[in-house]
UniProtKB/Swiss-Prot annotation:
This is CRISPR-associated endonuclease Cas1 2. The lineage of its organism: Archaea, Thermoproteota, Thermoprotei, Sulfolobales, Sulfolobaceae. It is an enzyme of class 3 (hydrolase). The gene is cas1-2. GO terms for molecular function: DNA binding; endonuclease activity; metal ion binding; RNA binding. Mn(2+) binds at residues 142, 206, 221. The keyword DNA-binding applies. Keywords: Antiviral defense, DNA-binding, Endonuclease, Hydrolase, Magnesium, Manganese, Metal-binding, Nuclease, RNA-binding. CRISPR (clustered regularly interspaced short palindromic repeat), is an adaptive immune system that provides protection against mobile genetic elements (viruses, transposable elements and conjugative plasmids). CRISPR clusters contain spacers, sequences complementary to antecedent mobile elements, and target invading nucleic acids. CRISPR clusters are transcribed and processed into CRISPR RNA (crRNA). Acts as a dsDNA endonuclease. Involved in the integration of spacer DNA into the CRISPR cassette. Homodimer, forms a heterotetramer with a Cas2 homodimer. Forms oligomers, probably binds nucleic acids as a homodimer. Its cofactor is Mg(2+); Mn(2+).
């Protein structure tokens, strides 16, 4: 139920409420009490419930609350009111994207994404002792790099997974796990972009449509290869999802959410930054860096993995 600073509520019938300023998770006759000071984020999946007093206590303590449904998409996210330099940052963001049509930030994000995909493949080439095409990615544009990347990923996965390429509508375990895991990543990124004062709906790469979190999708591209790594590592180690009717079963969704959140709380190494940090801390730091770069009209250096 608990993954370090993330509280995952996924068991059918679980209920979260407040007692004496403590978060209480009840499931049948079992109860667990947790101090809000020990939690940064609550993930709650379908078939669970949470009281308004628990939501109030969470937000008062700066805890975000993320809701995920059964179809690998988020219902929504509740954020505490902690936002920095909003007006100045959003104005600069609008001017950069709409007025000047500044492509520097989007280009750096895509460059970092391809670099991280290459680093991910290189890691597995080293660990498995087999050759792959990690060098080829660096000379290709995004669509071509993606084709090479996913083709190589398919060779790394156990045959019973049945993955033969990235497809958001795919019904194999890996594609479904990617959808669900990316949804968790999107909500985490949404949170930190908003806190940094950026407009999550105004992006550099993805098209702006009503309700489309364009900047969230843009920004996530740099971090997706690490999410891919977490899933490949888990599936190669025997982790499996239970799927029924084209959906991940409830208990498996909870297991997957815990796996991803735990992985995001592992330390990652970043090029040109020797300070150890978790992936979540890296996301938060880069949201602040991007906001600062946009406000000041300066270059932004994207997130680049070392593995």
């Amino acid at each position: 139920m608990i993954s370090v600073r993330t509280l995952v509520i996924s068991e059918y019938g679980a209920y979260v409420y407040v007692k004496k300023n403590m978060l209480v998770i009840k499931k049948g006759d079992k109860k667990v009490e947790i101090s809000p000071s020990e939690v940064d984020e609550i993930l709650i999946t379908v078939s669970c419930s949470i009281s308004t007093s628990a939501l109030s206590l969470a937000l008062t303590h700066g805890i975000s609350v993320m809701f995920l449904n059964s179809r690998e998409t988020p219902w929504g996210i509740l954020l505490p009111s902690i936002v920095t330099e909003t007006v100045k940052t959003k104005k600069a963001q609008y001017e950069a994207i709409v007025v000047r049509k500044d492509n520097r930030y989007g280009e750096e994000i895509i460059s970092s994404k391809i670099y991280n995909q290459s680093v991910h493949l290189k890691y597995w080439a080293r660990v498995t002792g087999t050759k792959n095409d990690y060098k080829e990615l660096l000379d290709k544009d995004e669509p071509a790099a993606a084709r090479v990347y996913w083709q190589n990923i398919s060779q790394l996965l156990p045959k019973d997974i049945g993955f033969d390429g990235r497809d958001v509508d795919g019904t194999d375990q890996f594609n479904m796990a990617l959808n669900y895991s990316y949804a968790i990543l999107y909500n985490t990124i949404f949170k930190y972009l908003v806190i940094a004062g950026l407009d999550p709906y105004l992006g550099f790469i993805h098209k702006d449509r009503p309700g489309n979190e364009s900047l969230v999708y843009d920004f996530s591209e740099m971090f997706k290869p690490y999410i891919d790594f977490l899933l490949v590592r888990a599936l190669r180690s025997g982790f499996r999802l239970k799927v029924k009717g084209g959906l991940i079963e409830e208990n498996s969704r909870g297991d997957l959410a815990k796996l991803i959140r735990k992985g995001m709380e592992e330390n990652v190494k970043e090029e040109s930054d020797h300070n150890p940090k978790t992936l979540i801390q890296a996301i938060r730091a880069h949201a602040v860096k991007l906001a600062s770069s946009i406000r000041e009209g300066k270059e932004y250096r994207g997130f680049k993995l070392v593995m």
